[in-house]
Amino acid sequence: MINVLAVAGLPGSGKTTVARIIERRGYLYYSLGDVVRAEAERRGLTPDKTAVTMRLERGRKAVIYELLKSVKPGEKVVIDGIRSIEEVEALEEFLGTVFLIYVVASRKVRYQRLTGRGRSDDPLSFSQFLLRDLRELRFGLADLLSRADYIIVNETKSIEELEQEIGKVLLELR
């Protein structure tokens, strides 16, 4: 059985929704975005600047190393917001085999989701949205698509449809 599930995808793709469904199936939930937002608050910076700064200061694995301080080997965990192959490798190094789920949705759908979410780090304009996508892709997010063990196309799926799909995936992992 695989105990470590990682969820990746561009902002607004539905990563957190997928990860929270997995959490309800008995996995402990951890968010790399929460790590960045907490560090941003501590530093007095925006989450976007903090994500870049952490990686510039301590390398591409900086955020995952911070998160790993809270995770115990052997726990069933879902990690929300993986950004690079290096982060997956760090998880594998400390926790064992990782099953990577990549969530995709169109630019239009993702922008609509983000502007309706109400989080402080959501884009205020379409140009900000595009810049955020570029930043995320520079972290190595696109490279994860070829490493994905499972891809969810989350364009128009209801929560119930996502729950059914994820349930089937988790059954196969047993």
Swiss-Prot record:
Keywords, alphabetical: ATP-binding, Nucleotide-binding
Pfam family, one: AAA_17
Residues that span the membrane, as ranges: none
The UniProt record lists the keyword Lipid biosynthesis: no
Superkingdom of the organism of origin: Archaea
Transferase as UniProt keyword: no
GO molecular function, one term: ATP binding
Binding sites annotated in the UniProt record for ATP: G9, L10, P11, G12, S13, G14, K15, T16
Entry's family note: Belongs to the UPF0200 family.
The name this protein goes by in its record: UPF0200 protein PAE1629
Species lineage: Archaea, Thermoproteota, Thermoprotei, Thermoproteales, Thermoproteaceae
